[in-house]
Amino acid sequence: MAKTSAVEKNKRRRKSVAQQATKRAALKAIVMNQSLPIEDRFKATLKLASLPRDGSKTRIRNRCEVTGRPRAFYRKLKMSRIALRELGNSGKVPGIVKSSW
């Protein structure tokens, strides 16, 4: 199990990203627009830099819904390989069976 504080911090970051998404997208569009004057683009860059860092999408870490483990994460199932194996062996994940040939 992951530390509760790490899981909660990630949830807080997801919330912050959702709140800041439109503002960040607008500022990034201004920064990337080559037809605008360099002064306006620079001001937009400064505003973007002044926003909270946790509002950036790259700060989010995919974590297992069951254990909170940050590595070996399967996106489709939203769980780690260890949780998948345990739940799959106990028959709690539909469509997952132990292979044999």
UniProtKB/Swiss-Prot annotation:
rRNA-binding listed as a keyword: yes
UniProt KW keywords: Ribonucleoprotein, Ribosomal protein, RNA-binding, rRNA-binding
Physiological role: Binds 16S rRNA, required for the assembly of 30S particles and may also be responsible for determining the conformation of the 16S rRNA at the A site.
Sequence similarity: Belongs to the universal ribosomal protein uS14 family.
Pfam families linked to this entry: Ribosomal_S14
GO molecular function, one term: structural constituent of ribosome
GO CC aspect terms: cytoplasm; small ribosomal subunit
Protein name: Small ribosomal subunit protein uS14
PANTHER family found in the cross-reference section: 30S RIBOSOMAL PROTEIN S14, SMALL RIBOSOMAL SUBUNIT PROTEIN US14M
Gene designation per UniProt: rpsN
InterPro entries for the chain: Ribosomal_uS14, Ribosomal_uS14_bac/plastid, Ribosomal_uS14_CS
Bridged cysteine pairs (disulfide): none
Region Disordered, residue ranges: 1-21
Keyword RNA-binding: yes
Organism: Agrobacterium fabrum (strain C58 / ATCC 33970) (Agrobacterium tumefaciens (strain C58))
Transmembrane segments: none
Biological processes annotated in GO: translation
Lineage, top ranks: Bacteria, Pseudomonadati, Pseudomonadota, Alphaproteobacteria, Hyphomicrobiales
Subunit structure: Part of the 30S ribosomal subunit. Contacts proteins S3 and S10.
